[in-house]
Regions:
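Conserved small/polar residues in nucleotide/adenosyl-binding loops
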Residues: 1, 164-171
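N-proximal low-complexity "stem/linker" segments adjacent to membrane-targeting elements
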Residues: 23-52
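A structural helix-start
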Residues: 36-44, 64, 68, 120-121
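Acidic donor-binding segment of Leloir-type glycosyltransferases
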Residues: 47-88
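Glycine-rich, basic loop-to-helix element that forms the pyrophosphate-binding segment
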Residues: 89-105
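Short aromatic/hydrophobic "clamp" motif used to bind/position activated sugar donors
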Residues: 110
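The conserved acidic donor/metal-binding loop of glycosyltransferases
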Residues: 114-118
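Conserved donor NDP-sugar-binding/catalytic core segment of glycosyltransferases
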Residues: 122-153
Length: 171
């Protein structure tokens, strides 16, 4: 086996990544799953960052986990800028919301982002290049704490995601 370096991205909190195995270089579609609960302003920041991606072959699936503060109007405001779908489920926690999003995914590569993330413009391009270079079934890595975080928040952020490599899948 080998070690697969994972790109380091500037995000607010923990970002989770999962991917299905890429079957061919022709299938280059990402499905970005975003579970959200009562965070319309954060989902707006994340969606805005996704509009600037240099890699354009992706869809966005927002799964609202029973929010009492509506985020559907914010999601709908991106219909003309993103390939985006919105689903509402009864409050069941982020795990079920993520799983529901995966069920709706049409892309070959599934990425799960928390609603409080902000991704740089080259994020998907870098992920795609890394996935083409290394054969992996799943990947993850450290994220960068937002500059507005306190020292305690930065320490908690570091302690929860202090790894940066994942073993590559052997073929």
């Amino acid at each position: 086996s080998s070690i697969c370096p994972v790109p380091f991205f500037d995000t607010r909190f923990l970002t989770l990544y999962f991917c299905r195995q890429i079957k061919s270089s022709l299938m280059e579609v990402f499905s970005i799953i975003i579970p959200v609960y009562n965070r319309p302003e954060e989902i707006d920041d994340l969606l805005n960052s996704l509009t600037r991606q240099t890699y354009v072959h992706f869809e966005v699936i927002v799964v609202d986990d029973g929010s009492s503060i509506p985020c559907e109007p914010i999601v709908n405001a991106y219909n003309d800028r993103l390939r985006i779908r919105y689903f509402y489920i009864e409050n069941s926690g982020p795990g079920l919301a993520r799983n529901q999003g995966v069920r709706y995914a049409e892309g070959e590569i599934v990425i799960v982002l928390d609603s409080d993330c902000i991704v740089p413009a080259s994020y998907l391009e870098q992920v795609h290049e890394s996935l083409m270079r290394y054969k992996v079934d799943a990947f993850g890595g450290a994220d960068r704490a937002h500059s507005s975080f306190s020292a305690i928040q930065k320490a908690v952020n570091y302690s929860t995601v202090s790894y940066t490599h994942l073993r590559a899948h052997e073929t």
